[in-house]
């Protein structure tokens, strides 16, 4: 076991702070409409250019182990915010850094970290409650386009594309982003279905960068029981191999033991391009969803209830689809080869069930099934001139899409960091002592995103924050793109309420953990010995060189 180094109290927190500062300094330059790009060296290929906070944070590893721990914790804030809300990673990082900085100052001066943490949590809770009150529901295509435009770094074309995609498949529909083949961005709506079950083994992955299994022009086997014995599965696998080894997706209650191990081995050897996932849903709902997939893909559910065994399955029982994408959590089936009339009949049947049911839960689940069958999948194909530009643009479209979904979920608030300031100004907590100090830390740090946006645009952050706070109209904020104070809703500068909420909650969570840290334990980095000098023994003949 390697030797460890232990640091205590102010020294420990000081080193953690240095790490947090270094990460925040690299991330915060990307913030706002006039934020700058960050160039990231890759271990192979050309460097990547990004203005996405989480992409920058993910690349940062610091040589000092204690500083690196601080940086990694704040990196987690950015990643978690991106996972939950799809955007707001830079906001979360800037907030975490400023809360930690303000808190550290007070704790060094003698405040009790635990009491300070309590005050911080109470203030954050109160701000979140105010954000929910001022959030405005997203009603039309124009508002959706505004949110998407802001999240795509003020690219109105991407905003329009996402708004159009949402209009076509509905807010419950599935929208995926792919790399296009041309210079133009394109929108394609494909009949398809997505359900929340991912691959049973990462060895099924075909695209290691995205960690996805992509099956083109594939067969689909649907079985309503567990598969653990390989001999039951063998006859149908042999038939698939005889067709020219088309890819196969197996959907069953579960696949385990010998069956799963054999499938993985055959996949790795290249004998069979296969992927296995669990069937979606539970109980009767699982049977209904398997039947939905069967109708959509033109297959049959192999079920002992109708006298069919897995051994008796034929190629005619298998469904077919143009493209199947399976990641860790979801399976998307695009271009199912099912009969259109049968799909329409199934949709009518589900609609009738929705009208008849009295249970809200059942109604919600039926509507989900309806969206999967009727909504289809919208595919946004991103176009660009170079691979570097393509990656950067695709990241922006992914961000914008996630932010738009968040906006539809919890509504929108005025953007540019203004909503947090407005919500904080309405908070009135009756606290005392160190708890009050904790609350004040949050209320001061909450202005950091607004100030950072102003600073990146070349304006005095203090003056801008003061002008926004003292504005008569509650919707007045700072438009960093033009340098004007405007009605943010009218100007279309909006943020999803969920993004602001999640960014604040995650930032407070990590900053309070850092502030209550009293010791750090880290490995001592040993300097690697220099490589030995090459042996010069073979040069003995040079002795006769007299000068």
UniProtKB/Swiss-Prot annotation:
It catalyses: ATP + H2O + a folded polypeptide = ADP + phosphate + an unfolded polypeptide. Residues 537-547 have a biased composition (Gly residues). It is an enzyme of class 5 (isomerase). Its EC number is 5.6.1.7. InterPro entries: Chaperonin_Cpn60_CS, Cpn60/GroEL, Cpn60/GroEL/TCP-1, GroEL-like_apical_dom_sf, GROEL-like_equatorial_sf, TCP-1-like_intermed_sf. CDD domains: GroEL (cd03344). ATP binds at residues 30-33, 51, 87-91, 416, 479-481, 495. One of its GO terms (cellular component) is cytoplasm. Residues 528-547 are annotated as: Disordered. Keywords: ATP-binding, Chaperone, Cytoplasm, Isomerase, Nucleotide-binding. It is found in: Cytoplasm. Gene3D superfamilies: GroEL, GroEL-like equatorial domain, TCP-1-like chaperonin intermediate domain. The keyword Nucleotide-binding applies. It holds the Pfam family Cpn60_TCP1. GO terms for molecular function: ATP binding; ATP-dependent protein folding chaperone; isomerase activity; unfolded protein binding. One of its GO terms (biological process) is protein refolding. Its main location: cytoplasm. It comes from the Bacteria. Together with its co-chaperonin GroES, plays an essential role in assisting protein folding. The GroEL-GroES system forms a nano-cage that allows encapsulation of the non-native substrate proteins and provides a physical environment optimized to promote and accelerate protein folding. Forms a cylinder of 14 subunits composed of two heptameric rings stacked back-to-back. Interacts with the co-chaperonin GroES. Belongs to the chaperonin (HSP60) family. This is Chaperonin GroEL. It comes from Nitratiruptor sp. (strain SB155-2).
